[in-house]
Amino acid sequence: MVWVPLLQFPIEWAALALLVVACLYWERSGFSGLGVEGCVASAMLGILVGYEWTGDYWLSCLVAAGAAAVFAIVSGTLVHLFRADPAVGSFALSLVPTSALGLLARSGDLRLFHEVPPPGLVTGTIFDGTYAEDLIASPWLLATPILLALAGWLLWHTPFGIRLRAFGENPGWRVPRSRPTALRLAALVLGALWTVPAAALLLRAHATAPPIALGYLALACAVASRWTVWGGILLAAGPALIRSARPYGTGFQSGFVILDVAPFLLGLLYLVFLSRRSLRLAASPQARIDPDVL
């Protein structure tokens, strides 16, 4: 048995963990974590298009951060102005950058996937050209534990309710003369920024076909963990392990398809067995208008 495909496990886990945190920020801002999928697609578009235009990897990551932030602001503003259902509105708006990413991926060869040495990795080490360089020489992967700790620390200081509608609800974070909507959008942008390192990791790990719908998988982990950071990160290990085992399914008929669908089936099982209370429809009308009520 070849163990090389399983080396993708830390990358898959890191990317899903970052997306779980992003979903928590969207949920605590009073919006739906379904919008994280649009943030991931926007970040991937920013990295790919930015590198095509500039040839500088880190500058393209800044472009990706801007693209993810713009999507968060635009989608949050539209959902707020039209008083749309956060889940339906976020899902519908996410289809726009996701479709654009699919069209770009099919438009031809992109520079980011064919540069030698690979951009975004530290070169000049003994791991150059080996399978281990994506683990040892990847600044994004090495920085992931720090980013997750920072995100968890920020959420730890905003413990009001399952969702937070605004960081301003915490007196320690209140900005004088600020409106709750502006604070909600600021939290939304902060959540969108966590998708940038996740997008960078996924583009490096899956250069031939950038993955989609992982934001939905991360949301399932967040919901099943009862909206906790570390619980969601631990639950993300299961789908990440299955995703890293996908190459083993090419040896038998329909194996690849089964392993491709299996992470989402596992996420569904998470929801069924671990979050029955979260999925139970509330009988009171307040549940439809108050984001702190599930």
Walk through the language-model features, giving the residues of each:
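Inter-helical junctions in multi-pass inner-membrane proteins, predominant
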Residues: V4-Q8, L155, G191-A222, Q253-V257, ...
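Single transmembrane alpha-helix segments in multi-pass membrane proteins
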Residues: V4-W53, Y57-C61, A65, A69-A87, ...
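Hydrophobic core segments of alpha-helical transmembrane domains in multi-pass membrane transport
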Residues: L19-V20, M44-L48, T98-G102, A143-L154, ...
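Pore- or pathway-lining transmembrane helices of multi-pass membrane proteins that form conduits
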Residues: T77-R106, E115-P118, P210-A222, G238-S275
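Transmembrane helix-bundle core of multi-pass membrane transporters
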Residues: P97-H157, G255, A287-L294
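Helix-loop-helix "hairpin" substructures at the membrane interface of multi-pass membrane proteins
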Residues: D134-A207, V229-L234
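Cytosolic-side transmembrane-helix boundaries in multi-pass membrane proteins
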Residues: A151, P159, E169-S178, R246-L294
